[in-house]
A protein has these predicted regions:
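Intrinsically disordered, low-complexity Pro/Gly-rich regions
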Residues: 1-106
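Loop/turn-rich, solvent-exposed surfaces of beta-rich toroidal or solenoidal domains
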Residues: 435-473, 482-527
Length: 589
């Protein structure tokens, strides 16, 4: 498992045979998410049946999660990176996002022409009239619409660009495949959420282990065995490469295939060691360990939460710092957001009539610094960023697309006062958050007192059926859309991965005949600089496009790009000959 897999002649292996008919098309940005664990006290049902694994290279379906914990999380910027999501600035050295492609080959595009025509009728019209600066739709991009922009300032091979971040374009932005790793063998749909980059290793969760791989070769450097399956991982990492995970109390058995996710562990990713592991009990659970859903990190505080309770620990030793207070009016900490600060979604009231409060917390004591009461009609809320404090919610369940976002709330973390509420029409913007999870937003970034969002895909200006989108921003003080606009380019779509100082690192998802690209968007001018352009030969394209953006993690750091899955399942018999990947990496010279 640890050794890199050498591709046969022609790259990643022979392409899969053509399907007998058009595969089910992949949902666009904002399509309803797969069912996740009921959150915030919802009654637990029977474990869902695992989905059938689609054939390799086909659009992926929507797998249900494994019961007992939430769906894969995405992250904020940390030293040497973490996956896609609401990346807020952190210390420099540091998320599962986009819609996935509907079509992987030109033949599938033609087969789906009828659907595409329907989309074209309304596509691409809304944006021209919705821009906050009133400028025409064509303005404000250095990428143009060709999808062929070079590294550097709109032009020649990586020179120029912004000084607002650490990521610089190499002399040659064309990448080569670094390594690829096969998925672990499983018999059920299984979470493998979590990946990080240190100065020496790419670290990825397995099923019951955490593995460090050589950054360039993919050879196994170390492995941390665990008592049970990994069920969640922090998106944050300390300066010395320490982080936290959740894992189950035991490995699954025939008699008990689903174990409780009740163990918190501290990891040292520099040495490949499990520093500590702990379970806790709550006053309402008797002697039973609390089942956790999510875990986060702020400074040296690990905070884990779930429907049954929560706790905070010291990152280095695992010593318990505090537990949330359980009140007589049925209030509890639903989950935490970490990063530069620590915040909580605290829930009171009944399931049918909840009242949510957002609190900035002292990470060491758990004491509230400030509180903001969310408006009526908000059943769940997601913490997008903790400093500045930004929260997303689907107010009155008006989003209607499964994105769980109708509005963003910019809150003063010191006073708890609302700065501004930003309406984010789900039909226009493609960010998304978990349906019940607190720290699971993706496809957006926060920095420069702005929130950066991808627009929904719409009709391009070139050949028939081409699709594209943009990245735009809103001011977190005024709530107004700014003049920022970065075009993905004809037939490409793009979404933010993280902040890099004042710049935005974004991934440009490729069309069926090109490789993907990593770009740096200047935070001041919004000019794009290509940092990496992936190979366009079919075998590599098929491997890159096999990762659906909503269920994958994307890490870019200093000329290395890693794409990994957050969910795996047993392959279908018909797809046993198809190449499957847990991780694919690219690098520039």
């Amino acid at each position: 498992f640890g050794a890199p897999q050498d591709p046969p002649a022609g790259g990643f292996g022979a392409p899969p045979p053509p399907p007998p008919g058009p595969p089910q098309q992949q949902p666009d940005y904002g399509y309803p998410q797969p069912p996740t664990q009921p959150g915030y006290g919802f009654p637990q049902g029977q474990p869902p049946q695992p989905p059938t694994q689609p054939g390799y290279g086909f659009p992926q379906g929507q797998p249900p999660t494994q019961p007992g914990y939430g769906f894969p999380q995405q992250g904020q910027q940390q030293p040497y990176g973490y996956p896609t999501a609401p990346m807020q600035p952190a210390h420099q050295p540091p998320q599962q996002g986009g819609s996935g492609k509907k079509f992987s080959t030109q033949a599938q595009i033609i087969v789906a022409a009828v659907v595409a025509v329907a989309l074209i009728v309304g596509g691409g019209i809304w944006y021209a009239s919705s821009g906050g600066d009133g400028k025409k739709d064509e303005a404000g991009s250095s990428a143009g619409t060709s999808g062929e922009n070079k590294g550097g300032k709109g032009g020649e091979g990586g020179k120029g660009g912004s000084t607002g971040g650490k990521e610089k374009a190499p002399a040659n932005v064309d990448s080569t495949v670094g390594f690829q790793l096969p998925p672990p063998k499983v018999t059920d749909t299984t979470t493998v959420d979590g990946s990080w980059i240190t100065d020496k290793a790419y670290v990825k969760t397995g099923v019951t282990e955490i593995v460090g791989y050589d950054l360039d070769k993919g050879t196994k450097l170390w492995s941390i065995p665990l008592d049970g399956q990994v069920c969640a991982a922090s998106r944050h990492m300390s300066k010395d490469y320490r982080t936290a995970i959740l894992f189950e109390e035991a490995k699954p058995t025939k008699a008990k295939p689903y174990q409780q996710c009740n163990k918190v562990g501290g990891l040292d990713l520099a040495t490949g060691k499990l520093l500590w592991s702990k379970s806790v009990t709550a006053s309402t659970s008797g002697d039973r360990p609390v089942r956790f859903d999510e875990v986060t990190l702020s400074g040296t505080t690990v905070a884990a939460g779930g429907t049954g309770g929560g706790a905070a620990f010291k990152l280095d030793t695992g010593a318990e710092l505090w537990k949330p207070k359980v009140s007589t009016d049925n209030c509890y900490d639903a989950g935490y957001g970490g990063g530069e600060a620590l915040a909580v979604v605290r829930k009171c009231g009944s399931y049918d009539d909840p009242q949510l409060t957002i609190q900035a917390l002292n990470p060491t004591t758990g004491a509230p610094i400030s509180s903001y009461k969310m408006p009526a009609g908000v059943d769940y809320a997601s913490i997008v960023s903790t400093k500045p404090l930004v929260v997303a919610a689907d107010v009155g369940e008006t989003a209607g697309d499964g994105s769980s976002i109708s509005d963003f709330f910019s809150i003063d973390e010191a006073t708890g006062k609302l700065k501004i509420r930003i309406s984010a029409d789900a039909e226009k913007y493609a960010a998304r958050c978990g349906s019940t999870e607190v720290e699971q937003c993706q496809h957006l970034a926060v920095g420069n007192n702005r929130i950066y969002l991808p627009t929904e895909e719409h009709e391009g200006t070139g050949e028939s059926f081409s699709r594209t989108n943009e990245i735009v921003s809103f001011d977190l003080t005024t709530g107004k859309q700014t003049g920022d606009r970065a075009d993905a380019g004809e037939k490409f779509t793009m979404f933010p991965l993280r902040m890099d100082g004042k710049n935005i690192i974004a991934y440009r998802e490729p069309p069926y005949d090109k490789g993907g690209e990593i770009v740096s968007i200047d935070g001041s001018t919004f000019e794009q600089t290509v940092l990496m352009r992936n190979p366009s030969d079919k075998a590599v394209r098929d491997a890159e496009s096999s990762f659906t953006a909503d269920y994958s993690e994307f890490l870019y750091e200093q000329g290395r790009f890693f794409i990994s899955k957050t969910m795996i399942s047993a392959p279908r018999k018909s797809s046993l000959d198809d190449k499957e990947y847990l991780v694919v990496s690219f690098r520039t010279s």
